[in-house]
Amino acid sequence: MASHPAHRSSKAADEELPKASSTFHPSLWGSFFLTYQPPTAPQRANMKERAEVLRERVRKVLKGSTTDQLPETVNLILTLQRLGLGYYYENEIDKLLHQIYSNSDYNVKDLNLVSQRFYLLRKNGYDVPSDVFLSFKTEEGGFACAAADTRSLLSLYNAAYLRKHGEEVLDEAISSTRLRLQDLLGRLLPESPFAKEVSSSLRTPLFRRVGILEARNYIPIYETEATRNEAVLELAKLNFNLQQLDFCEELKHCSAWWNEMIAKSKLTFVRDRIVEEYFWMNGACYDPPYSLSRIILTKITGLITIIDDMFDTHGTTEDCMKFAEAFGRWDESAIHLLPEYMKDFYILMLETFQSFEDALGPEKSYRVLYLKQAMERLVELYSKEIKWRDDDYVPTMSEHLQVSAETIATIALTCSAYAGMGDMSIRKETFEWALSFPQFIRTFGSFVRLSNDVVSTKREQTKDHSPSTVHCYMKEHGTTMDDACEKIKELIEDSWKDMLEQSLALKGLPKVVPQLVFDFSRTTDNMYRDRDALTSSEALKEMIQLLFVEPIPE
């Protein structure tokens, strides 16, 4: 939930509600995705048939890989994961990862191999030590890497971002290699594939990139590599284009749901961002089996946007408290508690949750109960933030994050994603773990909250808003806004280290659980890096076109 404007009377709110808000620009997409027409059934069937043939051909290559050819095997796994194909080969990759982890007999003087091995293992949950890089340090504090060995330099830079607290060798690797890569970039042809790789890494390290966007951007680069595998390349193109068809159908469904929601509820003041919300949530659950997760996530995000804008911008304290009371009842009879403008929305919200139960079927519909609990907690904490607003109370940073790390909807979103997964390893214990708000999800929540606040505070300070974490830090430590923002950027960076440490320590949970949280972190970083792209969504237009509009030429 964003920061709040000052408390308004019911009369003022009633005067505003029929009007569309001038605060938010209209949708950039209109009815574009509502008019989507899929390819004919034979066309799609042919694409799927060819993709299946290629998948098995690539599987044979993967099964033939051994740790005796470690550089080739590590590079193949990294390539498949970057191209968005790793999902199809989880068993084969897991087996190879275990062998790579267990086999310490490799060339520890090959900086590129050491970096790629470290990156691959840590990214996939193996807590390998970082002291393998100590032997590459020079007396001057840099890292021994020949000027011509630019690939090793880039691999080291990307590997170092999988760092934990106290790993000075990785901190030094980042600062040292960043300078060398920046210098190198100035000497490369701007349009060369390697220049694009370096530029992308300096902007966003490989570990922090949104997986589906990385696949879309990397496929054309992989196509230029002399060592490319033609079957892998063709499969990557086909797989992305097939996924794009699924994404467009899901977007059409979600857009129709949203338009009906707004038309029937008459809540014209809310942000019209259903395409951007789908793009955001897609970044967390882009693998083929997670269609229902993407749909549930997008609808939940849409509902949260409406509730947030009611609490944030248009609702009086009295109206919001009535909504909070009705919300926890989950029954149409509660509409008598609500003001007129909230009643239709409340009914439509109940219908949406019922549609989730119907889609999940009798074996998994219990998951919606946990999702409802998460949403109840969210609305309850929104009410606490309203009290802070009305009392003009400025909490400490710590106190603020105790609440706001949850009101950024971390529990609701993780439960939404888990709810839609067909994976039977997602059980009641998974939801109970998430609802307990464990430290791993709390850290993720702090990361999202701080990322949001650091880009939205300057915009919101022009209005009568209650304090964000930036303002809390300014008051608590007596700093300027610029200094507070710099400190919060440091805390955001620390959150990545915290999440990595905490994920490596997790036991007894399905592998997809921490993977999802990291994918949420990546897609959130993409939304809030340097700007609030949900509110000002022009920044996302090119990326949305790449993912949902433009197929890759085959």
From Swiss-Prot:
Q: State the tissue distribution.
A: Highly expressed in the husk. Detected in leaf sheaths and leaves.
Name the record gives this protein: 7-epi-sesquithujene synthase
InterPro entries, sorted? Isoprenoid_synthase_dom_sf (IPR008949), Terpene_cyclase-like_1_C (IPR034741), Terpene_cyclase_plant_C1 (IPR044814), Terpene_synth_N (IPR001906), Terpene_synth_N_sf (IPR036965), Terpene_synthase-like (IPR050148), Terpene_synthase_metal-bd (IPR005630), Terpenoid_cyclase/PrenylTrfase (IPR008930)
Reactions mediated catalytically: (2E,6E)-farnesyl diphosphate = 7-epi-sesquithujene + diphosphate; (2E,6E)-farnesyl diphosphate = (1S,5S,6R)-alpha-bergamotene + diphosphate; (2E,6E)-farnesyl diphosphate = (E)-beta-farnesene + diphosphate; (2E,6E)-farnesyl diphosphate = (S)-beta-bisabolene + diphosphate
Q: Which residues bind substrate?
A: D308, D312, R449, N452
Give the encoding gene's name: TPS4
Q: Does the keyword Manganese apply?
A: yes
Q: How is the cofactor bound?
A: Binds 3 Mg(2+) or Mn(2+) ions per subunit.
Print the organism lineage: Eukaryota, Viridiplantae, Streptophyta, Embryophyta, Tracheophyta
What would be an example GO MF term here? terpene synthase activity
The similarity annotation says: Belongs to the terpene synthase family.
User: Where does motif DDXXD motif map?
Assistant: 308-312
Q: E.C. number, please?
A: 4.2.3.101, 4.2.3.81, 4.2.3.55, 4.2.3.-
Residues annotated for Mg(2+) 1 binding in this entry? D308, D312
